[in-house]
Amino acid sequence: MATKDLFAQPEPSRQPASPAERMAALRAELHAHAHRYYVLDEPTIPDSEYDRLFKELQDLEAAYPELLTPDSPTQRVGGKPLDQFASVRHKVPMLSIRTETDTEATGAQNFDTRVRKELGLTESNPPVEYVAELKFDGLAMSLRYEHGVLVQAATRGDGEVGEEVTQNIRTIRQIPLKLPSDAPPVLEVRGEVYMRRADFEALNDKQREKIAAGAKGEKTFVNPRNAAAGAVRQLDPAIAAQRPLSFFAYGVGEVVLEAEQANPKNPWVATHMELLQALKSWGFPVAAQTKIAHGASELIAFHQAMGQQRDSLPYDIDGVVYKVNSLALQKQMGFVSREPRWAVAHKYPAQEQLTTVLGIEVQVGRTGKLTPVAKLAPVFVGGVTVTNATLHNEDEARRKDVRVGDTVIVRRAGDVIPEVVSVLPDKRLPGAPMFTMPRQCPVCGSDAVREEGEADYRCTGGLFCGAQRKEAILHYAHRRAVEIEGLGDKLVEQLVDANVIRTLPDLYKLGLTALASLDRMAEKSANNLLKALEKSKQTTLPRFLFGLGIRHVGEATAKELARHFGNLDAIMDATQEQLLAVSDVGSIVAQSIRTFFDQPHNREVVEQLRACGVHWEEGEPAAVAPKPLSGKTFVITGTLPTLSRDEAKDKVEAAGGKVAGSVSKKTDYVVAGTEAGSKLVKAQELGIAVIDEAALMRLLASAEAE
């Protein structure tokens, strides 16, 4: 007889023919997800998706109670512990609290109404006093102290039995190892182990460094919660100690008092807030945001205030928790279905959700940057419906390996642009192709290039590309460029949006009728702009060059190019080597100039501008004096103390030297840093001069002095 692995990766849900089949499918899927979440610490869906499936099963069981089975996930808190850790049976079960699915203000109102009804209160009775707390997104923990000494730390597990992780928890410096003498002889403190956002980012930075260095088996963490859970359940405490964990206390489990303290008529604490204050006095961290709230109105105010602060907190929360403050009233209200009637978790809209990638579109920004964007099946996340999520750049898209048709986790926090967090590769369609960035701009067809050391591809058709049109016009009209007085942001927006201007030459084709038809453009203003356009036709070569918006060509470089070559045609036709002969022009700038003028679209726009009457006085090329390192060939190898290889290369080339990629008999100098390798060995074999960075700087300085 075939058996089904309940903990196998679940298949995508489908709608069965009957409630019994649907309930069986949901139980299997929830068991599998609970196993991956609680046991393996490898969740594949966001919490919100698990909650949705769980709620669907609860609703079906309420509608068909005869189909309820003892093995249903609704009849227990969580999953089983791993065999590698010793099992711990909780003296007082670590039960979960009810989640209020209504994320609006009415969620708090609903809870208060239930409490007042349970306590038999009417409108004439005063508001119920609550404690409002944060709901941390971490790992629940029970800390057992005997005679003031930490003797055991255990995870929640299934609520009845957890795992002992004492050695790992001892590494968290916020958790006291010994309590003051006034603490009870036996005290179980309940709280949350979590990781601060800054610590999480620092940890992932270290992971990325390890991966870049070739370390095997290393990976980055999806979120702080996963990182914290993985650290707590490390078998090696030394590894756990390297993970920056934190802790907040929010309650107690078993408490055994001294004989003189155990007075039913005069309890050691009468309220939940008194309990938290006692924990704080014994050295446990308690969240500063915890406060007393009277009635539904103050619960609503707390929920709204924390929602506004949520993204600025140094740690993740996914909601707030309300608890009846009086311990006597808590006892009176009791539990239902293993959940306390006197507490509720009031969540915020989920910041992560599952959805499907319908396509990947490459968008072009105002400055020519190409950004891959995932087009998504609409999903409600972070309080809004999301249909697009940035993939940032080619490296990031490939690292996450996002493909069309993939099921992905998308995240949106606050006003942050939605992004794809991770992919569920087991749900990938067969044959889905990998994403690759286009080598031509999707808007204008010009070459898209990625410069060395940069993450982004950029369109090289700056003068022609529709996506860059507004930015190109504004830059051209800048007072330090060609200068067109009166042509500002708002007017450019109007002209481009109305399709009056498509390229720069269209500026000089504007007439009074077209301008006067624009909103808030009086005839006088239109005439003034036309005069400014006519005036701008007479400019200088440096201003015109700067106005073209060539990447890396600022005002100073434009002046040097004009001085060196004397005329625009010579600059447009200059080779890489000829450009490198210009003062302060290195390989990156030279390549950028060459790439710009290699695009036929850009040359066409330049010729059209000249045909419209834009002109300047051209001169003779400057006499080219030999540079101090002309004729010298350098090879740079290893890591230099202060300069990157590109910086060292630029300095050598600016002084007239040539930088080669390999050592030969024609090499004059090898500039060697640490870990120089085979190039240094070959230089020594050939008897070529080997210098360090300091010697290179002295050589450059002496060459300049000559």
UniProtKB/Swiss-Prot annotation:
Keyword line: DNA damage, DNA repair, DNA replication, Ligase, Magnesium, Manganese, Metal-binding, NAD, Zinc
Keyword DNA repair included in the entry's annotation: yes
Reactions it catalyzes: NAD(+) + (deoxyribonucleotide)n-3'-hydroxyl + 5'-phospho-(deoxyribonucleotide)m = (deoxyribonucleotide)n+m + AMP + beta-nicotinamide D-nucleotide
Active site: K135
EC number(s) per entry: 6.5.1.2
Pfam families listed in its UniProt record: BRCT, DNA_ligase_aden, DNA_ligase_OB, DNA_ligase_ZBD, HHH_2, HHH_5, Nlig-Ia
Amino acids binding Zn(2+): C441, C444, C459, C465
UniProt GO BP: DNA repair; DNA replication
Domain BRCT: 624-706
Binding annotation for NAD(+): D47, S48, E49, Y50, D51, S96, I97, E133, R156, E192, K323, K347
Cofactor(s) for this UniProt protein: Mg(2+); Mn(2+)
UniProt-recorded Gene Ontology molecular function terms: DNA binding; DNA ligase (NAD+) activity; metal ion binding
Superkingdom, taxonomy of origin: Bacteria
NCBIfam families listed in its UniProt record: dnlj (TIGR00575), PRK07956.1 (NF005932)
Job of this protein: DNA ligase that catalyzes the formation of phosphodiester linkages between 5'-phosphoryl and 3'-hydroxyl groups in double-stranded DNA using NAD as a coenzyme and as the energy source for the reaction. It is essential for DNA replication and repair of damaged DNA.
Family according to the record: Belongs to the NAD-dependent DNA ligase family. LigA subfamily.
Protein name in UniProt: DNA ligase
